[in-house]
Swiss-Prot record:
Keyword check for Zinc: yes
Cellular component annotations (GO), alphabetically ordered: extrinsic component of mitochondrial inner membrane
Any one Gene Ontology BP term: ubiquinone biosynthetic process
EC number: 4.1.1.130
This protein's pathway: Cofactor biosynthesis; ubiquinone biosynthesis
Annotated membrane topology: Peripheral membrane protein
Alphabetical list of Pfam families matching this protein: Coq4 (PF05019)
Source organism of the structure: Trypanosoma cruzi (strain CL Brener)
Keyword set includes Hydrolase: no
Name by which UniProt lists this protein: Ubiquinone biosynthesis protein COQ4 homolog 2, mitochondrial
Classification via HAMAP family: Coq4
Catalytic activity: a 4-hydroxy-3-methoxy-5-(all-trans-polyprenyl)benzoate + H(+) = a 2-methoxy-6-(all-trans-polyprenyl)phenol + CO2
């Protein structure tokens, strides 16, 4: 969490160095939060410190290094391949998600405010794999579900736009949804990168070659990444609460 705070501070410094563009994009984003171009611009202007960290984490991982070297892109052809995969595969779930929301990979906004080519690719990669993450954790495209995805992205990347998007979305939430935020932060922490010996291994999402799982069972992706889908986590929490309540009643 301290690292994420450091990256947020770095984002503030980056925004200050590009203040006119940042203020213009931020203002337009507030008035029109579905304006992908301005939201993307804010994300890029505040990203430099986090992007450096993301690149280093990729360089220290075998899969991450391969991704940086080959620089795969998520395109409409990727979606076409996924749509041909049978039910039960990650690709089938991804294709269904994209079809339901009428999304196409080629519709992603290209990176325009990151000068370094490698860092620009890291940012583009994060942007293009966003819908893979939606599919992996089982979230749709409501404001509340988008917040859940952004929280996980923030814990894995430190990109300030993740936390800024969460803060900016709070006024649109109901009281119950606001109360749920504590659970969502807990879930994101449970699914944060983890390489501690004897615990569930969770790689940085930047080091996951999502495309390689399109023709594989969805459960294999979950097993290899160690990520717990949000609905599974909430069911587990509900079960533990019910068990604790039952034990309390029995103890009376």
């Amino acid at each position: 969490m301290l690292k994420s705070g450091f990256y947020l501070l770095g984002g503030v410094v980056g925004a200050a160095s590009s203040l006119p563009a940042f203020l213009a994009a931020t203002t337009r984003s507030i008035w029109d939060p579905v304006n992908a171009g301005d939201v993307a611009a804010v994300g890029e202007i505040t990203a430099l410190t986090a992007l450096e960290h993301m690149k280093q984490s990729m360089m220290s991982d075998r899969t991450g290094r391969m991704i940086l070297r080959t620089q795969p892109r998520v395109t409409d052809e990727t979606l076409e391949f996924a749509s041909r995969q049978p039910p039960g595969t990650f690709g089938h779930r991804y294709a269904q998600f994209m079809k339901f929301n009428r999304f196409t990979p080629n519709g992603r906004t290209p990176v325009a405010h990151v000068a370094d080519p490698t860092l620009a690719y890291v940012m583009q990669r994060q942007r293009e794999t966003h819908d893979f993450l939606h599919t992996c954790i089982g979230c749709g495209r409501t404001v509340e579900e988008e917040i859940i995805v952004k929280l996980l992205e923030w814990r894995h990347t430190g990109l300030p736009i993740g936390l800024l998007a969460v803060i900016g979305s709070l006024p649109w939430l109901s009281r119950q949804q606001l109360r749920n935020m504590e659970l969502y932060f807990e879930w994101a922490e449970v699914n944060a990168p983890n390489q501690r010996h004897g615990e569930v291994y969770i790689p940085y999402i930047t080091n996951v070659w999502w495309e390689s799982y399109l023709d594989k069972p969805y459960e294999q992706l979950l097993a290899d990444t160690g990520i717990t889908p949000i609905d599974v986590f909430l069911q587990q929490k509900k079960g533990k609460a019910a068990l604790a309540n039952g034990e309390a009643i029995d103890g009376k």
